[in-house]
Structures are given as C-alpha cells and as structure tokens.
Amino acid sequence: MTLEERVEALEKELQEMKDIEAIKELKGKYFRCLDGKMWDELETTLSPNIVTSYSNGKLVFHSPKEVTDYLKSSMPKEEISMHMGHTPEITIDSETTATGRWYLEDRLIFTDGKYKDVGINGGAFYTDKYEKIDGQWYILETGYVRIYEEHFMRDPKIHITMNMHK
Amino acid sequence: MTLEERVEALEKELQEMKDIEAIKELKGKYFRCLDGKMWDELETTLSPNIVTSYSNGKLVFHSPKEVTDYLKSSMPKEEISMHMGHTPEITIDSETTATGRWYLEDRLIFTDGKYKDVGINGGAFYTDKYEKIDGQWYILETGYVRIYEEHFMRDPKIHITMNMHK
C-alpha cells in the first residue's frame, strides 16, 4: 500500500474504534436515563426509526415517544430500578449501522403502592441495533432474552435510607 | 521520525487498541456462552493450547473439550448462573499474547435436584492469558482467586418467573 492508502486505512479503523466507544457511551446514557427516570433525555438516545421489543418480544414500539411513554408508565416513581450492563460485544456493520450485545443484570424494588416491598431480580442477554444519523449514534432496535427473572417479597424491615425518586 | 515511521507507529498502536477491544469481546462471549450454556460456541473462545485452573487452581484442564465438558457437567440445567465481568485491565504483551484482569461477580441459583433452592454468590479476581492465532484471540489460561463465596438457602417462596434453561 502507498503511504496515502495506509493513512486512509488508519483513518477508517480509528473511526470504527471511535464508533464502538460512542455506542458504549450511548448505552451507558440509556441505562442512566432509564434508572434516573430522565425520560426526555432518554428519548435523545433513541433513533426516530426505533423498533423496540421488550419482554421477549411481546411488546413492540415504533417511535421514541412510544418507547419513553411506555417506560415512564411502567416504571413509576414507586419503583427503584437498576439496569447494569456488562461485557459489551459491539460490531460495526457499516459506516452508519452497528450491532451490540450486552450482558444485563437488573434489579427492581417497589417502595410504595400496590406492589410495595416486591423485589425483582434478573439477568438478560441484550441484542441491539444502532444507527448513525448526522454523525450521532442512536438505538434503533433493542430487545433481550431473559436468563432468568425472580419475584419475591422483600423483608419490610429493610430500611431504604436513600432513594433519588422520593 | 519520518512520515513513514510515524504511520508505522500509528498502525502498531491502533492494532493494540483493536486487540484490547477484541479481547474484551472475547471475554464477553465467554461469559454469555457460559451462562447461556452454549457449550459448542464457548469452545470457540478457548485456545487449543488452553490450560485452565478453576477453584483456586485445584482443577486443571488441558484442552477446550476438557474445559467445556467439565463446565457442562458442573453447570447443568438445574443451575442458573450469572458471571458478570467488570473493569477489565488488558495488557498486550506481544503481537500474539496478552494478559487480562477482570473483576467478577457471580451468582448461582439451583432450581431443582439435590441442591434445590441453594444460592451461591461471590466475587473473584480473574487473571487470564490470551493467545492470538491466525488473527483471532483465544483464552489460553484462565484462573481466579475468590474475594468471597457464600452459600445459603433461598426462600422457597421466591418465584422464578422466567428461566432460559427450563
């Protein structure tokens, strides 16, 4: 390869590394906004063309607003949630599309209302599709397959000393 | 340095970044296949020269098949497992060898059989050696030192609503 071609190849590969990092940060922002219940900011992580399937594909949505409205209604302030993403496997499929696998651990705690003291723990394998529009990466598709999910009653004597949603 | 030398240095450094990312993805695939009980796919992450020590080095294996057979037998369908890897420290030792440290959190749930309702939680520091063969990274050595491990009886009233292994 000529020097010119080698520099061009470097530029392309460095762009891919930057895209992988940007996608990891996009997902970090998604989890942070989800558990921080920052719905408007969460919407900015979703592609206008989003197709989302939740709960093993039973629930499907077709716009950022539909997704955030669903999340907002299904994760009210009475519910503390933690979605912890691990060991991503990101593949750049083209200059504007990518695929990502994430190992998810999740934890839900109901602090009030009908489900007070209910706890839910689980794990899942996420598979996402991402799309780059005008230099910015967005979540285009997200869905997961549960490893397991368990529901239980928490000991009421557990004292929640801090809760950002109350 | 000449332009040629500068391009060469860039190529070398970018290759190291790509190798670090590839190793992180390799480990993500290993954990995903382990907990998804996808033994054939797990085998593809292991080097033909693998030397593995589990349980603080007491168990040692010398081929991918030996490792996956052991894992398959010791982690049957009655056992939900979650191995969550955190904060990797990857060092590229040479063009074809690397070392990786991982902070592991693990959770095991026995859903049936002799150990029904047993739970095991723990944490460990993993130290791995990786090997690159024909451009592909593999786990060459993996072993860990336990931070702690705890065994307990889970409340039978905990309701497992989803389990990919059942």
Curated annotation (Swiss-Prot), chains A, B:
One of its GO terms (cellular component) is cytoplasm. Its EC number is 4.2.1.106. Keywords: Bile acid catabolism, Lipid degradation, Lipid metabolism, Lyase, Steroid metabolism. GO terms for molecular function: bile-acid 7alpha-dehydratase activity. Pfam families: SnoaL_4. One of its GO terms (biological process) is lipid catabolic process. Pathway: Lipid metabolism; bile acid biosynthesis. Induction: Induced by bile acids such as cholate. It is an enzyme of class 4 (lyase). It catalyses: 7alpha,12alpha-dihydroxy-3-oxochol-4-en-24-oyl-CoA = 12alpha-hydroxy-3-oxochola-4,6-dien-24-oyl-CoA + H2O; 7alpha-hydroxy-3-oxochol-4-en-24-oyl-CoA = 3-oxochol-4,6-dien-24-oyl-CoA + H2O; 7alpha,12alpha-dihydroxy-3-oxochol-4-en-24-oate = 12alpha-hydroxy-3-oxochola-4,6-dien-24-oate + H2O; 7alpha-hydroxy-3-oxochol-4-en-24-oate = 3-oxochola-4,6-dien-24-oate + H2O. The keyword Acetylation does not apply. Homodimer. Functions in the bile acid 7alpha-dehydroxylation pathway, which forms secondary bile acids via the 7alpha-dehydroxylation of primary bile acids, and is carried out by intestinal anaerobic bacteria. Catalyzes the dehydration step in this pathway, yielding a 3-oxo-Delta(4,6)-bile acid-CoA intermediate. This is Bile acid 7alpha-dehydratase.
